[in-house]
């Protein structure tokens, strides 16, 4: 899950004072001459920044902030949220949560052009905002023309709605199947993993074919990518055999597509046809090899956490999955297809999600809301928080309200829903309560679900405990594990 994903919504009109009124303070590696602020790391990856506080004067809804910049020798960040910074930081007045929206990253060399930060402030008026210009964890030189800095209201992206009246039909074996509960499997699952998850009560495992996750410009060697995929499919053969033995189903998850992501965090194949063609070909390969396994394959999970942050791209997150689904159906007419929504398959993206005009498709959502709670302390992101927190309105009913776009989508299209991921970091106060609230709602709605993740990274592993990543230790039984096992065994279902 990308913790900084921001969901776009409608905008309200407001204005902003002139750039000349902004008082910029210079930090590490920052200098100013006239209207030009320069950040120069002198070849080191220690970054640098300039900061300002601005008053948005009660702006709401969508905003667009712009500034002109020029870069030289800006290094490639090792995380998608590092690199060139044109970023806002403010506290959401409604929830109290901190927000860090930022512009798309640029690297290398580029001449003067406009950086654009587009985000949704929400319906509650926002006042003071911290603005950062700079470089984070990369080397290079960047110049900002602060006389060009501007903030304005912005009508945010509206994705086209298709197949508005379509009702999804399912074969009897899917339509009448009881609710399935399970977990994301480790990267290299063993028979012991499958057996243990089944003993806990798991009925479904999400098999992730993943590498170089969220790494920029990864998976560009197509021959090597296909060779890697073949190895993952060889392991899948074994996983399916173990799943049959222990009475489980497997969701086949292509976790990283060819081409990976660009430096703006958007999937490369949305604008690179060679990557898109290989993506579709990979699903054709999978369908040819595994068709006829409907008894054990829950579904083909087309694309993990699609991320499209521009409205106009040659191949949208939706069309990319449509092309893959159509290619699969020409080969395998029986296996269920699992489709994901934009913005990391988050619940708010279902406001504009459209169904495929295709039967036997299950729609997946990932639940990490509020992300400042679920991902606190992950890569230094977000301060400590607790669950529930009535002062912020964080409780079970808040989760219900955030899932409302998904429940509405399901009703509108008679669609089945699969929660492919949900979790809270091990050291979060009240994580067991958060998990139980989520599971209670998923069971109420009758949605299949997979906890993230079983016997994987220790931050999500329910057998680890500690107050930070450094102090986490495997202790076996934890309150989170008890909640998960109770949920897997349906003890909380009504």
Can you name each region flagged by the protein language model?
Residues 5-15:
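Bacterial N-terminal signal peptides
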Residues 13-15, 20-168:
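Extracellular and organelle-lumenal recognition/adhesion modules and their flexible linkers in secreted
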Residues 108, 183-193, 212-215, 227-230, ...:
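Acidic-and-aromatic substrate-binding clefts and catalytic sites of carbohydrate-active enzymes
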Residues 154-219, 223-226:
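N-terminal carbohydrate-binding accessory modules
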Residues 159-165, 429-494:
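Aromatic-rich peripheral "rim/lid" segments of glycoside hydrolase catalytic domains that contact
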Residues 193-202, 224-254, 264-299, 319-330:
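An active-site-proximal structural segment forming one wall of the substrate-binding cleft
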Residues 223-227, 260-278, 355-362, 379-380, ...:
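Aromatic- and acidic-residue-enriched segments that line the glycan-binding/catalytic groove
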Residues 273-393, 398-424, 444-450:
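Active-site region of glycoside hydrolase catalytic domains
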């Amino acid at each position: 899950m990308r913790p900084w994903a921001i969901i776009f919504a409608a905008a309200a009109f407001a204005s902003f004072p002139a750039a000349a009124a902004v008082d910029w303070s210079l930090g590490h590696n920052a200098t100013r001459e006239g209207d030009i602020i320069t950040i120069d790391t002198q070849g080191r990856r220690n970054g640098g920044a300039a900061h300002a506080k601005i008053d948005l004067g009660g702006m709401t809804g969508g905003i667009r902030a712009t500034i002109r910049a020029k870069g030289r020798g800006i290094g490639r960040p090792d995380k998608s949220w590092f690199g060139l910074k044109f970023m806002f930081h403010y506290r959401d007045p409604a929830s109290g949560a901190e927000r860090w929206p930022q512009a798309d990253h640029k690297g290398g060399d580029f001449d003067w052009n406009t950086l654009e930060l587009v985000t949704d402030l929400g319906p509650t008026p926002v006042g003071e905002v911290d603005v950062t210009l700079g470089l984070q964890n990369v080397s290079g030189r960047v110049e900002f023309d602060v006389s060009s800095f501007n903030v304005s209201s912005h009508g945010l992206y509206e994705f086209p709605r298709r197949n508005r009246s379509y009702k999804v039909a399912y074969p009897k074996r899917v339509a009448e199947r009881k609710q399935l509960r399970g977990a994301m499997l480790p990267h290299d699952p063993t028979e012991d993993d499958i057996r243990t998850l089944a003993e806990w009560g798991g009925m479904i495992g999400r098999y992730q074919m993943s590498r170089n996750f969220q790494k920029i410009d990864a998976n560009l060697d197509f021959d090597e990518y296909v060779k890697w995929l073949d190895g993952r499919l060889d392991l899948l053969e074994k996983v399916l055999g173990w799943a049959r033995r222990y009475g489980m189903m497997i969701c086949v998850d292509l976790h990283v597509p060819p081409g990976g992501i660009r430096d703006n965090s958007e999937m490369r194949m949305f604008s690179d046809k060679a990557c898109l063609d290989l993506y579709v070909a990979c699903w054709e390969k999978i369908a040819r090899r595994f068709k006829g396994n409907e008894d054990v394959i829950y579904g083909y999970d087309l694309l993990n956490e699609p991320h499209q942050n521009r409205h106009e791209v040659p191949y949208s997150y939706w069309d990319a999955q449509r092309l893959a689904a159509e290619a699969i159906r020409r080969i395998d007419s029986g296996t269920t297809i699992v489709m994901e929504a934009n913005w990391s398959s988050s619940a708010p993206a279902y406001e504009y999600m459209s169904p495929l005009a295709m039967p036997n498709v299950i729609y997946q959502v990932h639940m990490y809301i509020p992300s400042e709670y679920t991902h606190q302390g992950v890569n230094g992101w977000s301060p400590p928080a607790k669950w529930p927190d009535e002062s912020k309105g964080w409780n079970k009913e808040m989760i219900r309200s955030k899932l409302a776009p998904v429940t509405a989508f399901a009703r509108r299209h008679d669609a089945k829903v699969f929660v492919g991921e949900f979790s809270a970091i091990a050291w979060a106060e009240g994580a067991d309560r958060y998990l139980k609230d989520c599971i209670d709602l998923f069971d109420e709605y009758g949605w299949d679900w997979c906890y993230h993740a079983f016997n994987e990274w220790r931050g999500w592993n329910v057998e680890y405990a500690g107050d930070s990543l450094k102090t986490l230790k495997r202790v076996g039984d934890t309150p989170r594990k008890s909640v998960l096992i109770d949920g897997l065994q349906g003890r909380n279902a009504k």
